[in-house]
């Protein structure tokens, strides 16, 4: 066992002395030592309850004959970090989470690990660490928040974001917004729609690194506590059988994850996170693979923000196993992929009797919302390296559109124009210098997209950026434009009034300016250089790769 490096042998007597100082007995040190990585904090609603999950995990580890040892991980709430300087630090936290766990689990060689994340970057960060360390591991997340119940009906955080635009437009009073503010987020859990956190938690289950039910079991239920106990017990089985994360994360898992991603209509942030996660296992997930899978995978779900259903509805309809079973019926799931249950995907689906219980929430493959998946990859003269759009959340009128460029070099400048009523139907808002390097940090553009939707412009205005979007964004929001402006990409050459053509079915994004004019602009182009006062962000800007490859740190 790995832990013998610090518990066994004459020369490890000082190590044992330190471990006894923790209150551990000889009997406890004789058992496998299981690290429990807990991202609990009192800042993030999705993490406020994770101590309860950790206690359940530790109970499961002890029940199966192990000794649990808990240590912390950081987590950022993207909602609280939105639309200010803090959002620059969200994506960089992904690698920081992975690195810090690698440090802790190598300095203190545990025999196995249980990972407890919940919100946006904590899930991919922990998955990256899990694959990097490759010791027997299980992930169990904190679970989704329930949707809010308000006088106007069901609500979630995105309802509040869009409410700001509705007040600005005059469709909602500030008193009505206040009522929404207090009711939209009723308690603990990751925000209730198919936003980034829930997208990644569902995909962790799909990949096989979390138990069935991990992605959709509500945070406030006893079933979530039982799931955590089972995770603690299951990691001991993984240790006994020496099943490691890289035994599970193979090309088969990649194919399953991308197919389910497309069927669910997950966040576009999965196009950043999945390549970064799979790279830790030596696997290359490209934009072309995403698009190839999207073209043949039906979109079976329209969860908030694309529709009115929430994660609790997906859970009641059969959850991720039901979605996988539906895709399996047309050969889009590899049933032979291994999982942390110790069984294959196919064996899990059979044992669970996986089936769709509500065909309104999970459509049949014979009657999907769309014959193609939720995400599309666009390329063209404006994005030769690629761009990403959640096509399942785009209004039909915006699938093919020629628009007039309104150019802004920051999110703040664009928001000021939107809120000031200076954006009109037929415009394409271009926000640049918000990419991984140019931001730096690749901020989410949820505030401007929510303002567009709230002001009733969602079917008339596009937003194009080298930044990224929240999983809660809807509309013609095209992000991850590569190369980014700071790297000399064509988005840096766009001028006010240029015409841009969007053709999502044809996967095209083009700047309608002739090549001679672009050459003249390129000859005098000088990228905007921002003053970066944060040492962390300076390092990040130097080390980060393109969004087209997952914005990984080199």
UniProtKB/Swiss-Prot annotation:
Its EC number(s): 4.2.1.9
Pathway stated in the Swiss-Prot or TrEMBL entry: Amino-acid biosynthesis; L-isoleucine biosynthesis; L-isoleucine from 2-oxobutanoate: step 3/4; Amino-acid biosynthesis; L-valine biosynthesis; L-valine from pyruvate: step 3/4
Entry annotated with the keyword Iron: yes
Cofactor(s) needed: [2Fe-2S] cluster; Mg(2+)
Modified residues (N6-carboxylysine): 121
InterPro entries: Dihydro-acid_dehy_C, DihydroxyA_deHydtase, DiOHA_6PGluconate_deHydtase_CS, ILV_EDD_C, ILV_EDD_N, IlvD/EDD_N
Positions annotated to bind Mg(2+): 78, 120-121, 444
Active-site annotation: 470
Enzyme class: lyase
Keywords: 2Fe-2S, Amino-acid biosynthesis, Branched-chain amino acid biosynthesis, Iron, Iron-sulfur, Lyase, Magnesium, Metal-binding
GO CC terms of this entry: cytosol
GO MF: 2 iron, 2 sulfur cluster binding; dihydroxy-acid dehydratase activity; magnesium ion binding
Cofactor details (free text): Binds 1 [2Fe-2S] cluster per subunit. This cluster acts as a Lewis acid cofactor.
GO BP: isoleucine biosynthetic process; L-valine biosynthetic process
Substrates-to-products reaction catalysed: (2R)-2,3-dihydroxy-3-methylbutanoate = 3-methyl-2-oxobutanoate + H2O; (2R,3R)-2,3-dihydroxy-3-methylpentanoate = (S)-3-methyl-2-oxopentanoate + H2O
Role noted for this protein: Functions in the biosynthesis of branched-chain amino acids. Catalyzes the dehydration of (2R,3R)-2,3-dihydroxy-3-methylpentanoate (2,3-dihydroxy-3-methylvalerate) into 2-oxo-3-methylpentanoate (2-oxo-3-methylvalerate) and of (2R)-2,3-dihydroxy-3-methylbutanoate (2,3-dihydroxyisovalerate) into 2-oxo-3-methylbutanoate (2-oxoisovalerate), the penultimate precursor to L-isoleucine and L-valine, respectively.
Complex and partners: Homodimer.
Similarity comment: Belongs to the IlvD/Edd family.
Protein name: Dihydroxy-acid dehydratase
Organism encoding this protein: Nitratidesulfovibrio vulgaris (strain DP4) (Desulfovibrio vulgaris)
């Amino acid at each position: 066992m790995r832990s013998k490096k610090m518990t066994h042998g004459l020369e490890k007597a000082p190590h044992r002395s330190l471990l006894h100082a923790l209150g551990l007995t000889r009997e406890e040190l004789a058992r496998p030592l299981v690290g429990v990585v807990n991202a609990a904090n009192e800042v993030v609603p999705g993490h406020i309850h994770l101590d309860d999950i950790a206690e359940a995990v530790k109970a499961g580890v002890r029940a199966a004959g192990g000794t649990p040892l808990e240590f912390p991980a950081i987590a950022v709430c993207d909602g609280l970090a939105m639309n200010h300087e803090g959002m620059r630090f969200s994506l960089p936290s992904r690698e920081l989470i992975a690195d810090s766990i690698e440090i802790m689990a190598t300095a203190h060689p545990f025999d196995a690990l249980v990972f407890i994340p919940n919100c946006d970057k904590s899930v991919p960060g922990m998955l990256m660490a899990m694959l990097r360390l490759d010791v027997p591991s299980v992930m169990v997340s904190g679970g989704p928040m329930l949707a809010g119940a308000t006088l106007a009906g069901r609500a979630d955080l995105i309802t509040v974001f869009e409410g700001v635009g509705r007040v600005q437009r005059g469709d909602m009073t500030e008193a009505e917004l206040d009522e929404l503010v207090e009711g939209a987020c009723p308690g603990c859990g990751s925000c209730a729609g198919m936003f980034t956190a829930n997208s990644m938690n569902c995909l962790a289950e799909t990949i096989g690194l979390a138990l069935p039910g991990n992605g959709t079991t509500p945070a406030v239920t006893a079933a979530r506590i039982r799931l955590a106990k089972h995770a603690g017990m299951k990691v001991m089985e993984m240790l006994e059988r020496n099943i490691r994360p890289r035994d599970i994360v193979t090309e088969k898992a990649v194919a399953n994850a991308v197919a389910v991603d497309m069927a669910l209509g997950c966040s576009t942030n999965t196009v950043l996170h999945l390549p970064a996660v799979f790279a830790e296992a030596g696997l290359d997930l490209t934009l072309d693979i995403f698009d190839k899978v999207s073209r043949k995978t039906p979109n079976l779900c329209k969860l908030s923000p694309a529709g009115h259903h929430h994660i609790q509805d997906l859970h009641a309809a059969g959850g991720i196993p039901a979605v996988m079973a539906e895709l399996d019926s047309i050969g889009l799931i590899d049933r032979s992929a291994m999982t942390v249950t110790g069984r294959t995907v196919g064996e899990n689906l059979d044992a669970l009797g996986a089936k769709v219980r509500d065909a309104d929430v999970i459509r049949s493959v014979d009657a999907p919302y769309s014959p193609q998946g939720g995400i599309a990859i666009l390329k063209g003269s404006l994005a030769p390296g690629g761009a990403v759009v959640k096509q399942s959340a785009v209004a039909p009128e915006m699938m093919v559109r020629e628009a007039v460029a309104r150019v802004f070099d920051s999110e703040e400048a664009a928001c000021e124009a939107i809120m000031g009523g200076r954006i009109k139907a037929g415009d394409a808002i271009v926000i640049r210098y918000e990419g991984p390097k140019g931001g730096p940090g690749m901020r989410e553009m949820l505030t401007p997209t929510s303002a567009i939707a709230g002001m009733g412009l969602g079917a008339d205005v596009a937003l194009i950026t080298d930044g990224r979007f929240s999983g809660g964004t809807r509309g013609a929001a095209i992000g991850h434009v590569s190369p980014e402006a700071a790297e000399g990409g064509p988005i840096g050459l766009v001028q006010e009034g240029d015409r841009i053509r969007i053709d999502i079915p044809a996967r095209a994004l083009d700047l309608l300016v002739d090549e001679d004019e672009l050459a003249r602009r390129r000859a005098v182009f000088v990228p905007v250089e921002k003053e970066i006062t944060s040492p962390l962000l300076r390092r990040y800007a130097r080390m980060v790769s393109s969004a087209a490859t997952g914005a990984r740190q080199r």
